[in-house]
Amino acid sequence: MPNYYLADDTKYTRPSTSAMSNLTELCGLKGLADSMARFDPVTGEKNKLRKSYKNQLLDLTGKFDIPSQPSLVRIIRDPVLAETGGKSLSVFDRDLLSRGLDFDATPSTGIPGFNPAMLGMPGPGKPGIGPQVGGNRLLSVRRSYNTESARESSNNEETPMARRKRKGDDDTDGERRRKRK
């Protein structure tokens, strides 16, 4: 059996404070809260937080002054960035940038060297992959064939059902499978 040791005989009581308690009064901050209240409880007028109130806040922990503009100094002084320094940065060639960031209109002949068929996009005058919408079904993709060779090859292909009918084996309802069992 393991030995248990009692470290202290002190009995602890539950604190009497709860989330429903007025913590401002319990901590002795009611006077400070009243002096800095947004509305005056007697007149109901708005009190502006003046610069003179900042002196009363100096003793409290935390930041009370909001910076006017976001600062990048914290990001620049980041120790992770300090290790890499400027090693990962390099200077771009201006000619390369001007060629890569050309915002001229696309010529009417299309982009030289770009094959829209590689992306399944319709070429000039040819349908490609497009959306097929029907009823409550989800958007599906279908391939439309526009060439005569594709139509001929699809008409010449015989389905397994057509092959069976041509051979006289008209077992469409699974009679052969039932006989085997």
Curated annotation (Swiss-Prot):
What top-level branch of life does the organism fall under?
Eukaryota
**Record's compositionally biased regions (Gly residues):** 122-133
List the GO terms this entry assigns under cellular component, sorted alphabetically. Answer: core mediator complex; mediator complex
What GO terms describe the biological role, i.e. biological process, of this protein? regulation of transcription by RNA polymerase II
Molecular function GO labels: transcription coregulator activity
Q: Which residues form a coiled coil?
A: none
Q: Where is the composition biased (Polar residues)?
A: 143-158
Where's it found, cell-wise? Nucleus
Which keywords are on file for this protein?
Activator, Nucleus, Transcription, Transcription regulation
Primary site of residence: nucleus
Span list, region Disordered: 120-181
Function of the molecule: Component of the Mediator complex, a coactivator involved in the regulated transcription of nearly all RNA polymerase II-dependent genes. Mediator functions as a bridge to convey information from gene-specific regulatory proteins to the basal RNA polymerase II transcription machinery. Mediator is recruited to promoters by direct interactions with regulatory proteins and serves as a scaffold for the assembly of a functional preinitiation complex with RNA polymerase II and the general transcription factors.
Tell me the protein family, please.
Answer: Belongs to the Mediator complex subunit 19 family.
Assembly? Component of the Mediator complex.
Q: What is this protein called?
A: Mediator of RNA polymerase II transcription subunit 19
Q: What species is this protein from?
A: Yarrowia lipolytica (strain CLIB 122 / E 150)
The UniProt gene name for this protein comes to ROX3
